[in-house]
């Protein structure tokens, strides 16, 4: 979630500085605020969920599927939100100056090295149904 938090901070800063339409900062516009609000909410939920599962693990109460659930959800939401926040930058999103494009690329890669979302879905499916869908 750290990459998403950085995307949120950079997007906020950019949106407050970038001026359009009668010299207003683009942060003034509803869709920019919605994108920031959605991303901030998902980051907060993800961090809180990770802390909770960490506490449960420390107490010996965490099930493996809890880890899969958090990894799957946090990686997916971080990528989705960073892509949405990237839209705020328009063409500047690919500039090295803002780093948001780098974060999106790195988050895309985490879909592979953190264990594909599909694999975590199968682990969760097994926990929910009691049936293993993979060999």
Each model region followed by its residue ranges:
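Alpha-helical interface subdomain recognition
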Residues: 1-135
């Amino acid at each position: 979630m750290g990459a998403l938090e950085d995307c949120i901070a950079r997007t906020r800063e950019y949106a407050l500085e970038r001026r359009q339409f009668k010299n207003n900062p683009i942060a003034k516009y509803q869709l920019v605020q919605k994108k920031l609000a959605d991303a901030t909410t998902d980051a907060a939920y993800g961090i809180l969920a990770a802390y909770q599962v960490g506490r449960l693990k420390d107490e010996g109460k965490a099930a493996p599927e809890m880890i899969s659930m958090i990894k799957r959800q946090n990686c997916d939401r971080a990528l989705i939100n960073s892509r949405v926040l990237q839209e705020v930058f328009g063409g500047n999103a690919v500039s090295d100056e803002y780093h948001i494009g780098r974060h999106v690329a790195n988050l895309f890669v985490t879909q592979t090295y953190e264990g594909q979302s599909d694999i975590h879905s199968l682990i969760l499916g097994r926990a929910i149904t009691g049936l293993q869908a993979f060999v």
